[in-house]
Amino acid sequence: MAEPSVESSSPGGSATSDDHEFDPSADMLVHDFDDERTLEEEEMMEGETNFSSEIEDLAREGDMPIHELLSLYGYGSTVRLPEEDEEEEEEEEEGEDDEDADNDDNSGCSGENKEENIKDSSGQEDETQSSNDDPSQSVASQDAQEIIRPRRCKYFDTNSEVEEESEEDEDYIPSEDWKKEIMVGSMFQAEIPVGICRYKENEKVYENDDQLLWDPEYLPEDKVIIFLKDASRRTGDEKGVEAIPEGSHIKDNEQALYELVKCNFDTEEALRRLRFNVKAAREELSVWTEEECRNFEQGLKAYGKDFHLIQANKVRTRSVGECVAFYYMWKKSERYDFFAQQTRFGKKKYNLHPGVTDYMDRLLDESESAASSRAPSPPPTASNSSNSQSEKEDGTVSTTNQNGVSSNGPGEILNKEEVKVEGLHINGPTGGNKKPLHADMDTNGYETDNLTTDPKLAHMTARNENDFDEKSERPAKRRRVNSNGKESPGSSEFFQEAVSHGKFEELENTDD
């Protein structure tokens, strides 16, 4: 949309020039007055805008020549016309054919800069003259020159920067640190010391020739499956373990396949030989004796899963392959479960491999070992019981437990609500001179006369009696059975009888 002419002033122009800051008065601030008249005035001014003048300006500008229109908006003679630009571009293209691309870019850019500088100087002179007449036109012309003038030079500069970047991209070689190089070849082979290698360079590892055990490409798979089904079919003469059915799955009978290879893949001849030598075909793993099983388990304890050391030191009657096969059969049996419970064979992976972070198994092992190594508490000695008896005989006013540890002061005395009185429990042997429990003694075995003489404990006994009167209506607790199987009186009943008997004695004394 074309801008309105500078000469014609719009009706809203005067409103913008008269704008000022809104300064509320004291009455507005006191009464919290919100003046919304400014918004209403702006809406009214926007509604009163006359669009007919803008349409007339646009129609008049459409009939103007381009030179007058440019001078009207302040561009003057500095703006280049499209026709002149096309002519200069054609001349530049003809000159570029004779010279190199790099020189043409530099010279073209510098030449254009010179021409633009000349035109800028001439334009500035015209602007100074026109600025005296109309300052608004000069400001508009300067803004337009800043926008339009450097476009062509920036275009060529960006092209040169793109070319430089493309040259740098061609020379740039990215690092290949992210690639994983396969370490295959003579440079990656380990250097074995002289004393470790058992064989010489031209010496064979073993003297026997290789023997073909099975060729899967000679017979199709469906015929091989039919042959294995016929080989595993029972004749009805089997006894013992061999009479147990093996299921409907097809067993990979290596002995039968090897017989088929020896018969030159003749299925009938291979089946005839298998039926003739049934024991050799069915007993893939011979039975291990009890001594061999024990030696194998001892080898697992000593050497772990190093079957070479187990065969060399423990089970010399078997080969390494037989030891490996027996290990997988033995691991599925009940014998392995008993072995794992006794030795924790499958739970100490972190000892063999420190990198394993199985902390749960380690925590269980440590907790079990701590529980097993925990010693029982030592039994009480006779000195503890003798100390308690001597303290009772002396009649000292102190709260002493049955182990002989005393705590002085009324703050250490427990309340009757917290202590469950279940009779006298003394650890250790008791003497024959023990005083019987009667009405003049407290439930802990102390005489009430001695307790009342101490002023620190007098208020404690009175408070306990008041508490007992308030809570005497509670139901009695269940009786407890001691170690001899006899029923001992409950704490509440025992305590109730003792206190009630003591109150009865006090009433008799007051009557006297």
Curated annotation (Swiss-Prot):
- Where's the Glycyl lysine isopeptide (Lys-Gly) (interchain with G-Cter in SUMO2) crosslink? K239, K420
SUPFAM superfamilies the UniProt entry points to:
Homeodomain-like
GO terms for cellular component: nucleoplasm; transcription repressor complex
Q: For bias kind Polar residues, which ranges apply? A: 129-144, 396-409, 482-494
Q: Does this UniProt record's set of keywords contain Hydrolase?
A: no
Where are the coiled-coil regions?
none
Write one Pfam family the protein is assigned to: ELM2
Superkingdom, taxonomy of origin: Eukaryota
Q: What does this protein do?
A: Transcriptional repressor regulating the expression of a number of genes including SP1 target genes. Probably functions through recruitment of HDAC1 a histone deacetylase involved in chromatin silencing.
Q: What is this protein called?
A: Mesoderm induction early response protein 1
Ranked from the top, the taxonomy reads: Eukaryota, Metazoa, Chordata, Craniata, Vertebrata
